[in-house]
From Swiss-Prot:
This is Phosphopentomutase. Its cofactor is Mg(2+). GO terms for biological process: glucose metabolic process; glycogen biosynthetic process; glycogen catabolic process; purine ribonucleoside salvage. The gene is PGM2. The active site is at residue 165. The lineage of its organism: Eukaryota, Metazoa, Chordata, Craniata, Vertebrata. InterPro entries: A-D-PHexomutase_a/b/a-I, A-D-PHexomutase_a/b/a-I/II/III, A-D-PHexomutase_a/b/a-II, A-D-PHexomutase_a/b/a-III, A-D-PHexomutase_C_sf, A-D-PHexomutase_CS, Alpha-D-phosphohexomutase_SF. It comes from Homo sapiens. The keyword Transmembrane helix does not apply. Mg(2+) binds at residues 165, 322, 324, 326.
């Protein structure tokens, strides 16, 4: 075994090897010069940041800061990733050269490294076309859901979306879809990752993206897909006459992202007057100048300009998409003059109720219920389960993330079942199963029709949400996170929970709250199952433990796949008829405080709480 100082040398030697290779292969003058400069300055610290480890290709693809080096998103790492993905697809699909793939992109850009989503998309297209594979490359920015829609609609082998969704401005990402129109799940991520490692040296034509413009293999699907998407969306318009007459006014923000024109078109498809757009945020801007984080999930801070415009135009409802328009936040002005931002779970309850109610009106035959499904992820509210139990349709829970819901929805559809709706608490909604992923464009217009319909009954969204809780039982939720940049600390925290009451003994209580069941999807343990084995798939690479409490509370602690966060989700579910939400809220707050104090132990592990 090498001496400790030898390991330092080993790292330096590896760094030298990586940078030398980079200088041979990189043809982007900005990133190439940046690396040369760091070498000349002997800036080992910065070089380690850029070359420390290759970005890991997971089921969510890639997501990292743009800049030079194998740890970052740039021209060379995009070429390398795409070469690996291309070789993997060639192995998986014998008809790849007949069917082809789709590629689209958002509006992100990083001038200092010459990187942008559009450029990355063109380089990815160049890689596939150089191998004789047809590429449907959008000529302009689109929402992320347009990629899975195109895969399904044109029956392609795969899709790539270049986006970092609602991440900070310096980031970008590479998200992939399989031929079933859903995000990839394991083992494809491992296979792609291995293929990338085997195809690192750029192929002869990799850098020359000018070649693709004259290639017969390049197709621009923009016009036809735009048309077909909105034609399909029209099938989910249930009250066209109400929409034409409605007096409800809407404000929309695309938070400097891609959503503006698509949401305008969606409203027109539903015969709704298009929403008033927040002028400072409607056009794509990779600098995101008006917000600290371009994420509507962060709540009121992102919506300040929307509220100001809504107050000015007397609009009662604000619709906010994240920058790649796959998520949606909704806020409603209350009689008190305050704005209420609905949580992802609350909007999930409203949309689930609405899509079931609308479906039921068109399908009077009760026997159809046995083939009708709704899905949500294991960290989302169980409100759909409560509605399903009472109404007679099926509810299924999946692991966290739309990759699981999209793949499960496709399985059910292939079995002849109807999937009405799927959602996750992180403001992601699949209202129309022609897109097997979250879609903020369809969710925005369906929310607008719901609000317009309720207005004819003199009801607000808030009043209808209360009616849902009264009928099906209150579901009170609370979610937040702690920030932790150290993987070892995160591991220690979760290992402490697994050995809380002595070796291999999980906690029996959290403060005064007794625990009745524990499911650990990192290890595959579930003590509510007869064989103590979890039914849902397990993953050793991520931490996730769910505690069920004797008082009807459920809390999940898990790591984030894309951010340095340990998240928690807690919910109290009451049976129908329990109409004291304030008491439930008080109890839930006490439970959350106990979890933070006893299970997170922020002082011990030096965790930073979420900033208000």
């Amino acid at each position: 075994m090498a001496a400790p100082e030898g390991s330092g040398l080993g790292e330096d030697a590896r760094l030298d090897q990586e940078t030398a290779q980079w200088l041979r292969w990189d043809k982007n003058s900005l990133t190439l010069e940046a690396v040369k400069r760091l070498i000349a300055e002997g800036n080992k610290e910065e070089l380690r940041k850029c070359f420390g480890a290759r970005m890991e290709f997971g089921t969510a693809g890639l997501r990292a800061a743009m800049g030079p080096g194998i740890s970052r998103m740039n021209d060379l790492t995009i070429i390398q990733t795409t070469q690996g993905f291309c070789r993997y697809l060639e192995k998986q699909f014998s008809d790849l050269k007949q069917k082809g793939i789709v590629i689209s992109f958002d509006a992100r850009a990083h001038p200092s490294s010459g990187g942008s989503s559009r450029r990355f998309a063109r380089l990815a297209a160049t890689t596939f076309i150089s191998q004789g594979i047809p590429v449907y490359l959008f000529s302009d920015i689109t929402p992320t859901p347009f990629v899975p829609f195109t895969v399904s609609h044109l029956k392609l082998c795969a899709g790539i979306m270049i986006t970092a969704s609602h991440n900070p401005k310096q980031d970008n990402g590479y998200k992939v879809y399989w031929d079933n129109g859903a995000q990839i799940i394991s083992p494809h991520d491992k296979g792609i990752s291995q293929a990338i490692e085997e195809n690192l040296e750029p192929w002869p034509q990799a850098w020359d993206d000018s070649l693709i413009d004259s290639s017969p293999l390049l197709h621009n699907p923009s016009a036809s897909i735009n048309n077909d998407y909105f034609e399909d969306l029209k099938k989910y318009c249930f009250h066209r006459s109400v929409n034409r007459e409605t007096k409800v006014k809407f404000v929309h923000t695309s938070v400097h992202g891609v959503g503006h024109s698509f949401v305008q078109s969606a409203f027109k498809a539903f015969d709704l007057v298009p929403p008033e757009a927040v002028p400072e945020q409607k056009d794509p801007d990779p600098e995101f100048p008006t917000v600290k984080y371009p994420n509507p999930e962060e709540g009121k801070g992102v919506l300040t300009l929307s509220f100001a415009l809504a107050d000015k135009t007397k609009a009662r409802i604000v619709l906010a998409n994240d920058p790649d328009a796959d998520r949606l936040a909704v806020a409603e002005k209350q009689d008190s003059g305050e704005w209420r931002v609905f949580s992802g779970n609350e909007l999930g309850a409203l949309l689930g109720w609405w899509l079931f109610t609308s479906w039921k009106e068109k399908n009077q035959d009760r026997s159809a219920l046995k083939d009708t499904y709704m899905l949500s992820s294991t960290v989302s509210s169980k409100i759909l389960r409560a509605i399903a139990l009472k109404e007679g349709f099926h509810f299924e829970e999946t692991l966290t993330g739309f990759k699981w819901m999209g793949n499960r929805a496709k399985q059910l559809i292939d079995q002849g079942k109807t999937v009405l709706f799927a959602f996750e608490e992180a403001i992601g909604y699949m209202c129309c199963p022609f897109v097997l992923d979250k879609d903020g464009v369809s969710a925005a217009v369906i929310s607008a029709e719901l609000a317009s319909f309720l207005a004819t009954k003199n009801l607000s969204l808030s009043q209808q949400l209360k009616a849902i809780y009264v009928e099906y039982g209150y579901h009170i939720t609370k979610a937040s996170y702690f920030i932790c940049h150290d993987q070892e600390t995160i591991k220690k925290l979760f290992e402490n929970l697994r050995n809380y009451d002595g070796k291999n003994n999980y906690p029996k209580a959290c403060g005064k709250f007794e625990i009745s069941a524990i499911r650990d999807l990192t290890t595959g343990y579930d003590d509510s199952q007869p064989d103590k084995k979890a039914v849902l798939p397990t993953s050793k690479s991520s931490q996730m433990i769910t505690f069920t409490f004797a008082n009807g509370g459920v809390a999940t602690m898990r790591t984030s796949g894309t951010e340095p966060k340990i998240k928690y989700y807690a919910e109290l579910c009451a049976p129908p008829g329990n109409s004291d939400p304030e008491q439930l809220k008080k109890e839930l707050n006490e439970l959350v405080s106990a979890i933070e104090e006893h299970f997170f132990q922020p002082q011990k592990y030096n965790l930073q709480p979420k900033a208000d």
